[in-house]
A protein has these predicted regions:
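Residues that form generic nucleotide/phosphate-binding pockets
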Residues: 58, 88, 208
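Extracellular-facing segments of soluble proteins and assemblies that are Gly/Ser/Thr-biased and enriched
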Residues: 68-108
Length: 216
């Protein structure tokens, strides 16, 4: 990276933080510009909607972290602002003891799952600002997940619902993409890009997606 830090395994330094996504979602238009009342679902103390006022009562934080796309590019020092997922979880969601998995659903129909234990890290945010400006629809506004230790496909954009589950049973990666593209954890440091496929094979395949997956 430009600041001298080593890149994670298999990554190269990208030139800019661009809108990027799977083909079905990269150019999908999301109508909501203003605050969205999140739907809270599944194994929680009380399911329902989470208002902007509830989120606004949580401590706001600003953090600078790196973003790593599973297709092998990285961008250093992206400045995010929002609330910690751990604070949201303890104060608002209050998941039941058996909850172990969280599925994030986007307004664009995208969804992805992460283990609850990974989401409790101090740098996991529900973000609404990036680089000093409102998030905007290009980068997942009005609100998105930011989990710097995990590949970008886990960082769901345009959040509409947060669902707490016991396990991955009944969960599926969005059609038509195969489930093997969705690693159960997706940690960058361990290069958990996909299920079952070796990284020597998946790296060059994913690199081919880079020019095709940038928003037009």
């Amino acid at each position: 990276m430009a600041d001298g830090r080593a890149l994670p395994p298999g990554q190269f330094a990208g030139k800019a933080f661009v809108r990027f996504g799977l083909g079905r979602f990269r150019n999908k238009r999301v109508a909501h510009e203003g605050p969205v009342a999140l739907s809270l679902e599944g194994l929680v103390s009380e399911a329902g909607t989470v208002s902007a006022e509830q989120l606004g009562a949580l401590e706001r934080v600003r953090q600078v972290s790196d973003f790593h796309c599973v297709t092998t590019w990285s961008v250093a020092n992206v400045a995010w602002e929002g609330v910690r997922f751990a604070d949201f979880c303890r104060a608002i969601a209050r998941p039941l003891p058996e909850a172990a998995l969280v599925v994030f659903h986007g307004l664009d129909g995208y969804r992805c799952a992460m283990p609850l234990e990974d989401l409790m890290a101090h740098d996991v945010l529900l973000a609404d600002r990036v680089d000093g400006a409102p998030l905007g629809l290009a980068h997942g506004g009005p609100q998105r997940l930011v989990a710097p230790a995990h590949y970008g496909y886990k960082n769901v954009k345009h959040l509409a619902a947060i669902e707490f589950r016991k396990s991955r049973r009944g969960y599926s990666f969005p059609f038509p993409y195969p489930g093997l593209m969705d690693h159960p954890r997706g940690r960058v440091a361990l290069e958990e890009r996909a299920q079952f496929l070796p990284n020597w094979l998946i790296r060059p395949i994913y690199k081919l997606f880079v020019p095709r997956a940038v928003r037009k």
